[in-house]
Amino acid sequence: MRYITAGESHGPQLTVILEGVPAGLTLAAEHINKELLRRQKGHGRGRRMQIEMDTVEIVSGVRHGMTLGSPITLIVKNDDFKHWTKVMGAEPISEKESKEMKRTITKPRPGHADLNGAIKYGHRDIRNVLERSSARETTVRVAAGAVAKQILKELGVEIAGHVLEIGGVKAKHISNLSIEEIQIITENSPVRCLDKTVEQEMMDAIDNAKSSGDSIGGIVEVIAEGMPIGVGSYVHYDRKLDAKLAGAIMSINAFKGAEIGVGFEAARQPGSKVHDEILWDEEQGYTRKTNNAGGLEGGMTTGMPIVVRGVMKPIPTLYKPLASVDIDTKEAFQASIERSDSCAVPAAGVVAESVVAWELAHALVEQFGKDRMELIQQNITQHNKYAKEF
């Protein structure tokens, strides 16, 4: 499976085309809209989320609530486009009209794609960069992830995400929660945190950053249960599932690091405390005493829960802007301000769930049969029986 997204932040719409989704998957707009709404929530979101009420339109690949096996096209309209029709229109305009609009941006913002993108593509108006590099694009990545989650659900895999840290405020580790319990707790938390004792402290940190014109980042974790043993591969570097998951996390706007299992903590512990001892019993088959590997060894699943974390830097659009240089005059200046969040970590956790779900669904479809859901389900059932008796 693969997908491609298109659209600008203030353009008419965002589009994603999904290829390789098996036939026979139950899919309706309500499945996707539920995920889009989750992305819009979270303490610290900016005014854009009050403008947009994201809903999806399914325009191909689905008939009567069932996928056809052909490419699926999903569209999310930008309600704010009505205020940007001239600025973001596709038709040519004169230089005079361009100047009269006064929307040309020549001051790159530190931490954004602005300067590097302008140099790469030769844009003298940085708006041509920021419109596409905006995290608004993650709207349709979440839509794609919603389709992947539906695949996982029908294949017996559950997934959930939560926030571990915001602005240096850390949640306590809470274990032995089911995926359903994690989902219920986080959906009722303004910061998607499992630890209620630090919830208010996280919100205060966000509010303090906002009042001072600053922004803060954090850490999110995604957990998936029900993956069969041996999904992925050790044979080639580009087929290792952990590499794909890390790449997916790092592809999210403003994410600067990824961990699987105990992650970087493994460098501080001896091997005897890091590696997961193998157990076997008649009911479960092969299992592990611990899950420090985060459900992945040698690029393949171990049958234990998948545990992936991502680090999000503070959003670089600040209301107390940092120093920059005008690309036209070369004079020092304060970077331009676009409408932005003070903290998007809770929302980014939903995006992280989506990209992890896509990679897991892709791996299952690739390994167990690409054409139709019924065949994939049968093959996974046979594989699980084989692995248990191995």
Curated annotation (Swiss-Prot):
GO biological process: amino acid biosynthetic process; aromatic amino acid family biosynthetic process; chorismate biosynthetic process
Residues noted as binding FMN in the record, renumbered to the chain: R132, S133, S134, N253, A254, G298, K313, P314, I315, P316, T317, R339
One matching Pfam family: Chorismate_synt
CDD domains: Chorismate_synthase
InterPro entries listed in its UniProt record: Chorismate_synth, Chorismate_synth_AroC_sf, Chorismate_synthase_CS
Pathway(s) served: Metabolic intermediate biosynthesis; chorismate biosynthesis; chorismate from D-erythrose 4-phosphate and phosphoenolpyruvate: step 7/7
Protein EC: 4.2.3.5
UniProt GO MF annotations: chorismate synthase activity; FMN binding
Key words, A-Z: Amino-acid biosynthesis, Aromatic amino acid biosynthesis, FAD, Flavoprotein, FMN, Lyase, NADP
PROSITE patterns given in the database record: CHORISMATE_SYNTHASE_1, CHORISMATE_SYNTHASE_2, CHORISMATE_SYNTHASE_3
Positions of NADP(+) binding: R39, R45
GO cellular component assignments: cytosol
Gene3D superfamilies according to UniProt: Chorismate synthase AroC
Enzyme class (EC, first level): lyase
Entry note: cofactor: Reduced FMN (FMNH(2)).
Similarity-based family: Belongs to the chorismate synthase family.
Function: This reaction introduces a second double bond into the aromatic ring system.
Family annotation (HAMAP family): Chorismate_synth (MF_00300)
Self-association and partners: Homotetramer.
Protein name: Chorismate synthase 1
Natural source organism: Bacillus anthracis
Phylogenetic lineage: Bacteria, Bacillati, Bacillota, Bacilli, Bacillales
